[in-house]
Amino acid sequence: MITTRTAKQCGQADFGWLQARYTFSFGHYFDPKLLGYASLRVLNQEVLAPGASFQPRTYPKVDILNLILEGEAEYRDSEGNHVQAKAGEALLISTQPGISYSEHNLSKEKTLTRMQLWLDACPERENPLVQKIDLKGDQQQLIASPDGSKGSLQLRQQVWLHHIELKKGEQASFQLQDRKSTRLN
């Protein structure tokens, strides 16, 4: 079954320093029919104002994938680790119990725009805490998978995530790993 949902139908937030669109129930936005999709719990588009930060917080055991669309971000954890990611990069953070994480827009002049996905992590799998790759700008790129194949980020879940960039009138086709549950955004 194919369900179509426009950006205007998504949950929205505007806190001044943060503007967001929520595909699934998140924060103050709640729709009992939209609690996630299989292991995908969060799919947000967020714009952080220049210099804005998310304060440190803990997460459930999830893999957080950030696709940086514009700007540059810094991610820190309570263990002293930090990493930066800029436009055109994908950053995967494998959250751990008891560790807090914070996020910052490094620019004092430009906004930071990103897509953020949270995927439930399999409890018995452990991966590197932070992984990063370049989004190549190819028509189609595998960006995350359970085994890190084709230079992709390695997830703690049986999920394959592709980045597909099409110009008006272009088409693409590729073989799906799991025909039972596929999502296109």
List the model feature ranges, each with a label.
Residues 4-14, 21-31, 41-59, 69-76, ...:
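Conserved short histidine dyad/triad with adjacent acidic residue
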Residues 95-125:
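Ligand-binding loop in jelly-roll beta-barrel domains
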Residues 102-104, 125-133, 152-156, 173-176:
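A short secondary-structure junction signal
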Residues 113-148, 152:
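A contiguous pocket-lining binding segment that forms or flanks enzyme active sites
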Residues 182-185:
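Conserved small/polar residues in nucleotide/adenosyl-binding loops
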